[in-house]
Structures are given as C-alpha cells and as structure tokens.
Amino acid sequence: ITFLVGGGVGPSPAASGRWGGRMLVTHRRPDGVYERFTSDAPAGAVRFDTARADVTIGRSTVRQRNGVYALDVHAAGNAGEARLELEVQPLRHRYFPPVELRDDDFLSGYVVPGLAASASGRLCVRARCGRVTDVAAYHDHNWGVWRDVTWEWGAARGQELSLLYGGVYGPERARGEGAVNSPFFLSLVDSLGVRQVLRFDRIAYEGEAPAAGASGAIAPRRFTLAGTRGRDSVALAVEVEHAVATDMSAASFRRLFFQMRGRFTLRGRIGGAEVSDSGQGFFETYRTR
C-alpha cells in the first residue's frame, strides 16, 4: 500500500498541474496473479505535513495517533474498487532512524518507523470483504530525488532479529559508471532497538527463475551478502520463493525492477556473541535489459 506524493503524477501531468498524489495497492491472489489498484489526485486534493505522518490523497487517508497508523484507502483496478480499513501497530523498538543517502548529485531520504509491525482490519474488493488480525506488516517513508535511480533493498523478520539492508545508486552508478566503496548498509534490530549497522559492498545473485509480470523476465534464484563493522561480521543468505518484475523506462537506460519474497538465514558474530536467525522477508533489485 503506497501513499505517493510527487511531481508529474498521473497519465497527463501537464493537464493536472506540476504535482499531485497517487494511491497504489498491489494484491497477490492465492493463485499467484497480481492485481493493481490506483487512484490519482491533483495537488488541491493532497494534504501532507513534514512534522507528522498524516497524509490525505483524494478520498484516502493515513492518520498516526499514539504510535498507531490508521489507513482508509480507496483505489480502483480491473478487478473493481478496493477499500481498505487497517490499523498498523509497530512493534516496540523495531525501527530504523531517518537517514539521507547521497550519491554525487542526488539526495534521497529514508526512515522505517515500523520495521516489524502487526496489522488488523478489513479489506474489500467490490462486494467481497475479508478481515485480517495481527498479520505481519512493515512501514517506511521515502523522500527526495528518485529519477533514474536504482537501489538494492530488503527487509525481513526472524525469530529474534529484524533486518534491513539497502543502498541507492544514482544515474551514473546505474549505468555502471563510477565507484563507491561499501555503498550498502545492513541493520540488525532486536527487542531493545538497533543492535548493529554493518557495511557491505556487493550482493552475489545466483541462479535463474521465471518471474511474474514483465514478459520474459528472469529473476535470481538466490543471493548472499556479507556485512562487516570492526570485529563484527554476519553472512545473509536468501532463497527466493517468488518474484514479480516490472519493466521500467528511464531517460538514460532500460531496466527491470524485481520485487521478491523469500526465506533467509543469518549467521555471524556481533559484540563478541554468536548470532543466528531465520525467517521470511521481501527484497528488491534491478537488472538492466
């Protein structure tokens, strides 16, 4: 579920003004088919505040009170109109503080108020409704410049630890130009908060598997990375269980955007103690055409 505010939103940005808002809901059915629901709003129907998390985009709203996010979402797609009424409750101390990521001439910001959270409420498509109770959820905020930008990202939840990794490439890095040492971070979070933030410089993708979405798209079957900081080090391995690809067009290059679900294992040493965990997560990457 995405509340998006930005420039040139909608099929005809010039006709609707310089900026606006979009609601985006993506639903994966039990048969593996993805359904997409959207709703665009002009600038006059958008409300947001840099001092709080409340956002209004047309008929859709999110309100944060006492740490709980209340979502009321309206969007439409080929399957009909979607309506969501949800409450998202982040788990205590399971967050990642705000950071701003720089690469040459662009700046992008990121914060994760709900690295691990639970969601409850009602979801409807047309006249069919269902309820969810205390299902696993995640919530983040992004801001800044994202034109011609690519990234590596992942968030996962184990028995003891939550993890988050990422890094952003500007247009030059996305085309394979330039060099940056250890451009990625890996954050490990437990019930007391951030336990360690490590650095790594590459992700090793292996194998091939068909992806849903874009025709002919091939996703990685697995990947690994190794993060270090001082004497601390961990190894993360992910087996991809499902992937969907979106064909993206940019001013300077063509690319495929992959959203993947999979299982992870984590092993290493933090603060002189062994760590080991496993669980499920969601991961994103790009591949050029």
Regions found by a protein language model. Give the residues of each.
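Structured soluble/peripheral alpha/beta segments that form catalytic or ligand/cofactor-binding pockets
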Residues: 1-289
